[in-house]
C-alpha cells in the first residue's frame, strides 16, 4: 500500500523499560540496528499494525506491554536512491510512520526474535533513550529524532530522570556531514538473540 506521493504507511515501535532504556535490535544478516517497524496492511489501523508488528518482530503480546502514547499524524523519511525500485508499478520513495511508545510490563524473557519463520532481527539489547538517533542508518536519523523528541515527555512520566533532554550529539547526528556511523555487530555480541542457520539473502527494507 503506497500513497499518491510514494510513501508507504508504516508503524514504528519504541519499546521502553521502566528505567528509560529502549529495545534496540540488529537486522538479520545485516550490520544495521534499529527499532521494530513495519508496513500497514490496507485493512489495518495503526494500532492493529503496531500489535501485529510487535508480535512478529519481538514475540511480545499485548498483555506484555502498556501503550504510553503515539506521535500525532505521519512522520516521513525518504529512502536513499539506491533503495528505490524504479521498475515497480507503484514506486515507493519512503515511509510515512506513526510511532508508538510502549512500556514493557512483562518479563523480558518473553522476547522471542524467532517467533516467525522469517525473523527481522537476530540480536537485541537495551540502550539509552537517545542512543538510536546517533546509531541508526543515516537516512532514518531525522525521523528517529522527531519521534523520540515527541515521545520523550511521555517516557519521562515513567522513567523520570532516566530520560534526559536530547543531548547535543544526538540533535546533530542526523545533520548532513555528520560522521557518526551506525552500529555494527561484534564478533561475540553482548546481546540477546539467536544465530540464523542459513542466509537467504536480503529482502526489501521494512
UniProtKB/Swiss-Prot annotation:
One of its GO terms (molecular function) is pyrophosphatase activity. Residues 175-206 are annotated as: Disordered. Its cofactor is a divalent metal cation. Keywords: Hydrolase. The keyword Hydrolase applies. The keyword Transcription regulation does not apply. Its EC number is 3.6.1.-. Residues 6-149 form the Nudix hydrolase domain. A motif (Nudix box) lies at residues 38-59. PROSITE patterns: NUDIX, NUDIX_BOX. CDD domains: NUDIX_Ap4A_hydrolase_plant_like. It is an enzyme of class 3 (hydrolase). InterPro entries: NUDIX_hydrolase-like_dom_sf, NUDIX_hydrolase_CS, NUDIX_hydrolase_dom, RppH. HAMAP family: Nudix_RppH. Accelerates the degradation of transcripts by removing pyrophosphate from the 5'-end of triphosphorylated RNA, leading to a more labile monophosphorylated state that can stimulate subsequent ribonuclease cleavage. PANTHER family: ADP-RIBOSE PYROPHOSPHATASE (PTHR43736), DIHYDRONEOPTERIN TRIPHOSPHATE DIPHOSPHATASE (PTHR43736:SF1). Belongs to the Nudix hydrolase family. RppH subfamily. This is RNA pyrophosphohydrolase. It comes from Stenotrophomonas maltophilia (strain K279a). The gene is rppH.
Amino acid at each position: 500500500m503506497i500513497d499518491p506521493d510514494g510513501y508507504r504507511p508504516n508503524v514504528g515501535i519504541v519499546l521502553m523499560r521502566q528505567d528509560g532504556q529502549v529495545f534496540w535490535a540488529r537486522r538479520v544478516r545485516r550490520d544495521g540496528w534499529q527499532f521494530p517497524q513495519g508496513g500497514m496492511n490496507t485493512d489495518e489501523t495503526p494500532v492493529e499494525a503496531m500489535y501485529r508488528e510487535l508480535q512478529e518482530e519481538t514475540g511480545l503480546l499485548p498483555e506484555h506491554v502498556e501503550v504510553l502514547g503515539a506521535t500525532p499524524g505521519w512522520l516521513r523519511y525518504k529512502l536513499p536512491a539506491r533503495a528505490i525500485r524504479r521498475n515497480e508499478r507503484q514506486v515507493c520513495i519512503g515511509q510515512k510512520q506513526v510511532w508508538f511508545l510502549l512500556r514493557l510490563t512483562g518479563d523480558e524473557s518473553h522476547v522471542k526474535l524467532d517467533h516467525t519463520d522469517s525473523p527481522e532481527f537476530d540480536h537485541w539489547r537495551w540502550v539509552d533513550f537517545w542512543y538510536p538517533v546517533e546509531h541508526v542508518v543515516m537516512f532514518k536519523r531525522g525521523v528517529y529524532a522527531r519521534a523520540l523528541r515527541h515521545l520523550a515527555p511521555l517516557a519521562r512520566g515513567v522513567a523520570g530522570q532516566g530520560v534526559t533532554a536530547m543531548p547535543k550529539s544526538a540533535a546533530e547526528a542526523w545533520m548532513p556531514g555528520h560522521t557518526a556511523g551506525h552500529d555494527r555487530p561484534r564478533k561475540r555480541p553482548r546481546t540477546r538473540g539467536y544465530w540464523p542457520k542459513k542466509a537467504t539473502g536480503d529482502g526489501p527494507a521494512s
